[in-house]
C-alpha cells in the first residue's frame, strides 16, 4: 500500500515557526518520522509539502485518480479553502486529517475545518506523532 502524506503552507518551516505551538521538530524530522513509521509498518509513503494551493489540489486529484489513502495536514487551508475541500472530497480511499497543535485551543477561526466532515478520521493536538498514528491506522485498516 502507498500513502500520500500531504502538508500545506508553512509546514516546511517546522522547528522555526512558533516552536511554542508546533514544537522543535523540523520538517526533515517529520519526513524521517513518516518514512520510519512506514518502513516499520511495511507500507510505502510519499511525504510532500507545498505553499501553493493549486499544487495541493493537484496532489489530491492524483490520490483520487490512483485510489491512494491520504494523511492531510492542510494547515491554514483547513479553515477556508473550498478548493482543497472539493479536491479532498474526491478521494475515495481513507483520508485522515492531521493537525500538530490542538486547533480547538487556539484562535476561534482555527476551530472551523472545511475538511473534518469529509475526512475518514481526524488526529488533532498530538504533535508530529499524530502522523505516525494516522499511518498506523491506515496500515491496520488495509489488512
From Swiss-Prot:
GO terms for molecular function: 3-dehydroquinate dehydratase activity. Pfam families: DHquinase_II (PF01220). It catalyses: 3-dehydroquinate = 3-dehydroshikimate + H2O. Its EC number is 4.2.1.10. Catalyzes a trans-dehydration via an enolate intermediate. Homododecamer. This is 3-dehydroquinate dehydratase. It comes from Saccharopolyspora erythraea (strain ATCC 11635 / DSM 40517 / JCM 4748 / NBRC 13426 / NCIMB 8594 / NRRL 2338).
